């Protein structure tokens, strides 16, 4: 069962930039894979999360292709060690999403005060955004913590 769950999370993880809040959704299932236990301890909560991830793959929102001539906007927040973000660009009067981002802070950073976790989250999200923007340096940061 662990092998199948790892495969499912790997496939889903490949599509994570199209799934808003992926990190929060998948966190419980990743925690079930930790340790040397043979059994997963599958319960109703795991089933709900699993089904939500399956549903998210089939109903992902439409994302736009980036225009490297325009400024990018990065919105994100950090809660309980998970950073969730959205990279987008203004298309007329509408902010159009390009990617949804999610990252876990490392164990050390999770213990920091809120203000320092926000700094660590900023560094993580900017690093992820640069991968998707091909290193274009015109990114407008909007930080929400």
Label for each model-derived stretch:
Residues 5, 9-10, 29, 53, ...:
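Mobile genetic element proteins and their domesticated derivatives, centered on retroelements
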Residues 55-63, 106, 127-131:
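Conserved helix-loop functional segments at active or binding sites
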Residues 1-70, 145:
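C-terminal reverse transcriptase regions that engage the nucleic-acid substrate
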Residues 12-15, 115-136:
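Metal-dependent nuclease catalytic cores in nucleic-acid-processing enzymes
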Residues 70-79:
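Two-metal-ion RNase H-like nuclease active-site motif
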Residues 91-120, 124, 144-145:
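A short, polar/acidic, helix/strand-boundary loop motif
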Residues 15, 81-84, 93-94, 107-108:
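Flexible loop/turn segments at secondary-structure boundaries
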Residues 137-143:
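Hydrophobic beta-strand segments of well-ordered beta-sheets in folded domains
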